[in-house]
Structure formats: C-alpha cells, structure tokens
Amino acid sequence: MYTSAEVWVREFVFEVFQRPFGGEVRWCASWQDHPEAVLRLEAMWRAWEVLHQDDGLGLSRWLLSHFDPSFTVLTGRTGPFARCTVERHVA
C-alpha cells in the first residue's frame, strides 16, 4: 500500500495520529537521522502492511502490539527524540 516507511509516516501516521508535540510528547522533524527511530518506524510500517489486510483482529493487533508501544518509546522523555523539538534536531 505504501512504498516506504517514510511515505507511510508522512501519509498515514501524521494524518491519523495527530498528537500535540512538546512537553512529554517529543518528535523530531529529522526523524530519519535517528537510527532507532528509523528501525522502529520501519518495523511498524512492515507490520502495518501485513496486519491491516486482516479483516479480523489485524488492526487491533497492530495497534496494541506494534504502534502503541513503539510510538510511546519514540515520543517519550527518554526516547530517541529526547533532546529534539519539532523545530530543532539534536543528534
């Protein structure tokens, strides 16, 4: 459905999961420069591509087992974006 994790983040994640970034929830506009973020988002995208096709519990399984825990780590106070802001990348 999506050709890459980068396209999936831009066209799906940001459209569906709109979070107010700042404070406890962190994001980096240069997420591609954070190896952990790339790995986690790639894993979430690959799981999405398989599980969203499951008419049964696929979406629930994806949310609970893949998206929720990984996105919480990514955007948390001690995650890969801990020193970044939406406007400022810190390697």
Could you say what each language-model-derived stretch is?
Residues 1-27:
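Short terminal alpha-helical segments
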Residues 4, 8, 32-42, 54, ...:
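Alpha-helix boundary/N-cap detector
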Residues 10-17, 42-52, 68-75, 79:
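Alpha-helical repeat scaffolds in large eukaryotic proteins
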Residues 17-51:
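Amphipathic alpha-helical interaction modules
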Residues 56-91:
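Amphipathic alpha-helical binding modules
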